[in-house]
Amino acid sequence: MTREGNSCCKAHEKISAPLATEQEYFDRYLRKTYSPDIFLEEALAFVDDAHAEQKPFFLYYPSPIPHVALQVPVEDLDAYPREWDEVPYLGGSYLPHPRPRAAYAAMITHLDKEVGAILDHLQSLGLSENTLVMFSSDNGTTWAGGVDHEFFGSTQGLSGLKGSVLEGGLRVPFIAQWPGKIKPGTVSEFPSYFPDLFPTLLAVAGQPDTRPHDGQNLVPVFQGQELLRKKDLYWEHGDQQALISGDWKLVRRRLGKKNPTTKLFHLVKDPGETNNLATEKPEVLERLLNISKNSRFPSLVFPNSGLDLP
């Protein structure tokens, strides 16, 4: 048993045929307590404690939604058309749901309410004017658990999904609010990624930036300054490797396996990564391969099968 009598269920259960009614799904797979609501309660309490003690605070709020399994309070689900879902999701990779498209949209709606609750709470405590709020996501949209990314147009023409080092797996929204520092409506084309947040937060907190890292301080970007990218962007995930250097992107996949691929894309001209220029631009390819080689350290804990293992 879990919090407030929530019984456990198999996380990846698959049913052979649709259940007779929506209520049967809810009775079998929905519980009394919705975990994102508990996350929110704890987050607001954390802010209250810091405010009561008149201390600065850093709140990292990793909402578990939207994410599979598709689960959301029924009142959020009912805001979306039943016509969206002619076929239920029977489960397998995650739990079944009678209205998977509506459930995914409703989870995003619930997240929107969470963000609004945090912003309203900061406002009620008089903290909004002196608080930097940043919103982002950890990866692109998924294919699993009944999520219909094609229905929602989630990738907007980009290649790849969650788990891929193609742009559809890497590009995520990033929104920042900082009254008096960030002009509302500002849009930046500066290429950035999560390693940039460490030096950015050090700068915001007025702390020295003395440790080696891969990031670049984004405060000048927040303030509307034109900034050049000083450090290349580098990723590894599973048997994949990617590097962005200027307008160019190197993508290596299936490393350590049969038929590995090495591709080169010009992201400005080809954000959908459809035109492999590795053969046409051998000098650019060689340069990015050398940069990627020097951008990494072998890992004994999480070895890359194609780069670390013999």
Where are these regions (language model features)?
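Basic phosphate/pyrophosphate-binding loop/patch that engages nucleotide-derived ligands
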Residues: 223-228
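Active-site-proximal cap/lid insertion segments
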Residues: 1-195, 204-213, 252-259, 268-274, ...
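Short hydrophobic beta-strand that contains or immediately precedes a catalytic carboxylate
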Residues: 264-265
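Glycine-rich, aromatic-lined ligand/substrate-binding cores of catalytic
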Residues: 199
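WW-domain-binding short linear motifs
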Residues: 231-234
